[in-house]
Amino acid sequence: LVAIDIGSSSIKLVQLTEFKEGQYELTRFGMMPLDADCIVEGAIKKPGQVANALKNLIKAEKIQSRYAVSAVAGEAVFIKKIKVPVMSEEELSAKITQEAEQYIPFDIDDVALDFQILGAVNADKEEGSEDSEESESADDSPQDNDEHKEDSHEEGEMMEALLVAVQRDVIDERTNILMEADLKPAIIDLDVFALMNAAQLTTDLSTMGTIALIDLGDSFTHINIIQDGAMGYTRDIPVGGGYLTNMLMSKFQFPFKQTLDIKRGKFSSSMKEEEVIEVIARAYKKVLEEIQKSFEYFSTLSDHKIERVLLCGGGSMIRGVDGFFADYLKVPVEIMDP
């Protein structure tokens, strides 16, 4: 399998080879930049150009495998913990459409549904993650993210399930791009679950308490709060590393490529590192404010505080970004490996 990450500014490609049971070696990695108008605010505007860029990347990296995995995220994705009466997986599978209709903000006929049973819970227990949603706007207070109907089941033994809905046209769009690049789609996952799986390769998330896995993308910052190894809350903030790139270009009057080098810590002799750090801090202030709001919202509803932050995504490569986040959020911050 080859893994394809289609982001706002570039396409990333990774291929792993299992050399021992459960142990993998990175055998291929490549990246192909995309024009700024190819993907806007997470939506693919020029699928033909994206497919051509993917074709060129596959050719450049000499990829032989035709089977691909990819992932989707953003406003087309809905994730929510729900409570339902205790039943078997087969029974819930037969009733999931009826259950989902009272929660999801999309036409039920236009989405692909899935679920995972998380276990029995006290019917009267309030869980903050019940009000979590994948596509909350950064301009909306997290406290407003509670507009869905409350569970209306009669009192009795209840269980918790993770409900996932994805608009079919987004899945079809991603599938078509892979096929246009002469690949065979094997899996279309959700970004949040793909990141959790990647983190789980090197860290036992179930033993880490309550952590935040934060993906610093170019157009979006994705917050994923994981509690004892299970998804607890997700949020998308429509501000990312692209905002920092624009600020650096404006400040230092450098072309795009040189600005990317600056973000990686490659300063020219004419620059003062303190000035770069100041711009980075100002650029991420808005993101950090929104992350802090999300942490407070989750803590208020779940009675759990964030114990650690794991950073990933292109923004995590910015020199010193983990220090900025740790200073502001007052929790330990690490760069995720892998």
Per-region residue spans from a language model:
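Glycine-rich phosphate-binding loop plus the immediately following alpha-helix
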Residues: 39, 168-197, 230-271
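Non-catalytic, solvent-exposed interaction/assembly segments
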Residues: 1-99, 133-136, 142, 148, ...
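Phosphate/pyrophosphate-binding loops at sites that engage ATP/ADP/AMP, CoA/4′-phosphopantetheine
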Residues: 54-67, 254, 292-308
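Short flexible coil/turn linkers enriched for glycine and charged/polar residues
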Residues: 7-10, 64, 74-76, 109, ...
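Active-site neighborhood for divalent-cation/phosphate handling
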Residues: 71-201, 308, 338
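Gly/Thr-rich phosphate-binding beta-strand-loop-beta motif of the actin/hexokinase/Hsp70
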Residues: 1-33, 66-73, 202-233, 237-243, ...
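Adenine-nucleotide phosphate-binding core of ATP-dependent small-molecule kinases
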Residues: 261-308, 314-315
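Conserved phosphate-binding/catalytic loops in two-lobed NTP-binding clefts
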Residues: 323-338
